[in-house]
């Protein structure tokens, strides 16, 4: 990695508040970080209630918003140098990686970008084979490796 590596954070919307904290920690280490558009909106408003942003559940006409958010983040991944997956516990499952983050990881993998995952991979995932096949760097909750790689 060259100095000035741009890290794109990928995460379930349920983890966006944590993602903002991780972003702040990486920025303090001199790393450029991009978070999803909804995470930026949550940070600006201070409202981290996911339901307030996922309006397509109530109004199917809003799925175009979901599509735009996905496309925008895919563009951010394409323009970044690596991704960091925030995979906290969700629905009682440690290391949760949902379908949207799997798609983002697949894009990064296809583009030969390093994939960092904050916590251990989920146990008994229906896509365990695919996750392991992307050869991610598992940080085990510690950002030091990512920071070191980004500063080289």
Where are these regions (language model features)?
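Conserved catalytic or regulatory cores that recognize and/or transform ribose-phosphate-containing ligands
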Residues: 1-152
């Amino acid at each position: 990695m060259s100095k000035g590596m741009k890290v794109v954070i990928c995460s379930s919307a349920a983890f966006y508040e944590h993602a903002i904290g991780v972003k702040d920690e990486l920025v303090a280490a001199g790393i450029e970080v991009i978070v999803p558009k909804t995470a930026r909106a949550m940070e600006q408003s201070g409202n981290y209630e996911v339901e307030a942003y996922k309006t397509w559940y109530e109004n199917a006409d809003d799925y175009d918003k979901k599509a735009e958010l996905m496309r925008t983040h895919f563009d951010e991944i394409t323009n970044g140098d690596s991704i960091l997956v925030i995979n906290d516990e969700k629905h009682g499952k440690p290391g949760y990686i949902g379908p949207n983050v799997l798609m983002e990881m697949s894009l990064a993998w296809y583009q030969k970008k390093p994939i960092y995952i904050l916590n251990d991979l989920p146990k008994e995932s229906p896509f365990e084979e695919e996750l392991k096949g992307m050869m991610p760097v598992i940080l085990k909750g510690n950002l030091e490796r990512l920071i070191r790689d980004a500063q080289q």
